[in-house]
């Protein structure tokens, strides 16, 4: 069986930057999970003493605090700034972009529509910068019953699919007089999704490596399943099953933006020993 990696996969700029920050900030604590990958978070804890706090209420005697890649809410940031702590911001620059857009456009009187998951930490952070009305939706059907003004600004969670974002934009074009569209989907996300789709079209089995709570990794799984029914999401090599590869000729592999190369190599090695 041939094993083929997607042309684009794995660590994005924002995650690489955050990992480097954490490694250079030993014996610190992150506010929320730094990235959505349990294996890498465990490595940072064991090797560099970087622990994870669920939220700011858990802060005690920590002297150095790291803001997660997904960012935090404006209120939480203000609280952190008021504390006598060293604050290191690992928020991805591409996540800060929709935060800034939402703050600016809402201050200019625009209703804000965010395409994303309302429970995702990135979306919670972006939403908190709105000064007026803000709506979070995942599809067009959710927009139909909302009372939105004729002056709207649209942004997206950085890890969402461009096709679905476009559908939201097209609908709003027919219902508003003034619409400002900001494509805040990360370019690395788009490239990884495109590469996964291309590989899944020819693969007999697809392995997607990443955190099961990772938005961009789950998107890769959904995309792969559109073209390859034998698509599986795993966090590490121990979750692989031999029967997945029986009578298969091509195994495609891709990985989420928070998946380190060392995990990917372990998965490839394990598949080689199984086949």
From Swiss-Prot:
Tell me which cofactor or cofactors this protein depends on: [4Fe-4S] cluster
Under InterPro entries, the record lists: LytB/IspH
Biological process annotations from GO: dimethylallyl diphosphate biosynthetic process; isopentenyl diphosphate biosynthetic process, methylerythritol 4-phosphate pathway; terpenoid biosynthetic process
Q: How is the cofactor bound?
A: Binds 1 [4Fe-4S] cluster per subunit.
Pathway(s) the chain acts in = Isoprenoid biosynthesis; dimethylallyl diphosphate biosynthesis; dimethylallyl diphosphate from (2E)-4-hydroxy-3-methylbutenyl diphosphate: step 1/1; Isoprenoid biosynthesis; isopentenyl diphosphate biosynthesis via DXP pathway; isopentenyl diphosphate from 1-deoxy-D-xylulose 5-phosphate: step 6/6
Keywords (alphabetical) are: 4Fe-4S, Iron, Iron-sulfur, Isoprene biosynthesis, Metal-binding, Oxidoreductase
Catalysed conversion reaction = isopentenyl diphosphate + 2 oxidized [2Fe-2S]-[ferredoxin] + H2O = (2E)-4-hydroxy-3-methylbut-2-enyl diphosphate + 2 reduced [2Fe-2S]-[ferredoxin] + 2 H(+); dimethylallyl diphosphate + 2 oxidized [2Fe-2S]-[ferredoxin] + H2O = (2E)-4-hydroxy-3-methylbut-2-enyl diphosphate + 2 reduced [2Fe-2S]-[ferredoxin] + 2 H(+)
Q: Which residues of the sequence carry a binding annotation for [4Fe-4S] cluster?
A: 12, 92, 186
Report the superkingdom from the record.
Bacteria
Q: Which residues are listed for (2E)-4-hydroxy-3-methylbut-2-enyl diphosphate binding in this entry?
A: 36, 70, 120, 158, 214-216, 258
Keyword Zinc attributed? no
The transmembrane residues are none
Instruction: State the function annotated in the UniProt record.
Output: Catalyzes the conversion of 1-hydroxy-2-methyl-2-(E)-butenyl 4-diphosphate (HMBPP) into a mixture of isopentenyl diphosphate (IPP) and dimethylallyl diphosphate (DMAPP). Acts in the terminal step of the DOXP/MEP pathway for isoprenoid precursor biosynthesis.
NCBIfam families noted in UniProt: ispH_lytB (TIGR00216), PRK01045.1-1 (NF002187)
What the record says about family reads:
Belongs to the IspH family.
Q: What is this protein called?
A: 4-hydroxy-3-methylbut-2-enyl diphosphate reductase
Q: What species was this sequence derived from? A: Campylobacter hominis (strain ATCC BAA-381 / DSM 21671 / CCUG 45161 / LMG 19568 / NCTC 13146 / CH001A)
Name of the gene: ispH
């Amino acid at each position: 069986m041939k094993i083929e990696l997607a042309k684009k996969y794995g660590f994005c700029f924002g995650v690489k930057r955050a990992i480097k920050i954490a490694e250079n900030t030993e014996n610190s604590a992150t506010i929320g999970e730094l990235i959505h990958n349990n294996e890498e978070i465990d490595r940072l804890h064991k090797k560099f003493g970087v622990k994870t706090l669920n939220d700011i209420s858990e802060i005690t005697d920590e002297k150095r605090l790291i803001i997660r890649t997904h960012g935090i809410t404006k209120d939480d940031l203000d609280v952190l700034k008021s504390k006598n702590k060293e604050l290191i911001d690992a928020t991805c620059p591409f996540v800060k972009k929709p935060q800034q857009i939402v703050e600016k456009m809402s201050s200019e009187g625009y209703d804000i529509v965010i395409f994303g998951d309302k429970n995702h930490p990135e979306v919670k952070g972006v939403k908190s910068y709105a000064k007026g009305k803000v709506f979070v939706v995942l599809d067009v059907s959710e927009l139909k019953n909302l009372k939105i003004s004729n002056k709207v600004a649209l942004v997206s969670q950085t890890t969402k699919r461009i096709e679905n974002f476009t559908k939201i934009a097209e609908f709003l074009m027919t219902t508003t007089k003034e619409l400002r569209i900001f494509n805040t989907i990360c370019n690395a996300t788009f490239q990884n999704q495109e590469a996964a789709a291309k590989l899944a079209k020819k693969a007999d089995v697809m392995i997607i490596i990443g955190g099961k709570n990772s938005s961009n990794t789950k998107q890769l799984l959904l995309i792969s399943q559109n073209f390859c029914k034998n698509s599986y999401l795993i966090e590490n090599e121990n979750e692989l099953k031999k029967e997945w590869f029986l009578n298969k000729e091509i195994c495609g592999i891709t990985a989420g933006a928070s998946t380190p190369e060392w995990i990917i190599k372990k998965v490839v090695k394990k598949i080689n020993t199984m086949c």
